[in-house]
Amino acid sequence: MHSSALLCFLVFLAGVGASRHQSTLSEDNCTHFSVSLPHMLRELRAAFGKVKTFFQTKDELHSILLTRSLLEDFKGYLGCQALSEMIQFYLEEVMPQAENEDPDIKQHVNSLGEKLKTLRLRLRRCHRFLPCENKSKVVEQVKSTFSKLQEKGVYKAMGEFDIFINYIEAYMTMKMKI
């Protein structure tokens, strides 16, 4: 009887130790995240560079989709939600359409999407960067404008992806100072 109780206790201690180790790993990943962020942003910019000319030359509209209001939302109390919603918007609405624009760019748009998914995953693992639940009115406005632009919306949204990367960088820089 004593040996089975001892065995259960040892299994319990092993589990506690493993969970502490996992927690430490997660915290370490968040600590190193600020070091790896510039590299991830460079990778996003490089991936976007492969499709930038294609989308910007097809964008014939003289308006801005990603306005300064979005950057202000990123910097404000809704920054977390605005960033989360914009990443989701690009991954679920913009990039699937962008992939269908030309077979020659499909692979590059897909690669850009994978890099954005990796960034989102790392942000979610470090709750200090994405601890949010509220909706951003500016993001809803971006989505509404995108929809109204119909087939031209994908050129506009993809053509301005570099602005989006800059806004991500501004948000992350602000969060790292906190």
UniProtKB/Swiss-Prot annotation:
Cited InterPro entries: 4_helix_cytokine-like_core, IL-10, IL-10/19/20/24/26, IL-10_CS
Pfam families named among the record's database cross-references: IL10
Subcellular location: Secreted
Cellular-component GO terms for this entry: extracellular space
GO process terms (BP): immune response; interleukin-10-mediated signaling pathway; negative regulation of B cell proliferation; negative regulation of cytokine production involved in immune response; negative regulation of inflammatory response; negative regulation of interleukin-6 production; negative regulation of membrane protein ectodomain proteolysis; positive regulation of B cell apoptotic process
Cystine pairings recorded for this chain: 30-126, 80-132
Keywords: Cytokine, Disulfide bond, Glycoprotein, Secreted, Signal
Signal among keywords: yes
Function: Major immune regulatory cytokine that acts on many cells of the immune system where it has profound anti-inflammatory functions, limiting excessive tissue disruption caused by inflammation. Mechanistically, IL10 binds to its heterotetrameric receptor comprising IL10RA and IL10RB leading to JAK1 and STAT2-mediated phosphorylation of STAT3. In turn, STAT3 translocates to the nucleus where it drives expression of anti-inflammatory mediators.
Subunit structure: Homodimer. Interacts with IL10RA and IL10RB.
Family assignment from sequence similarity: Belongs to the IL-10 family.
Protein name, per record: Interleukin-10
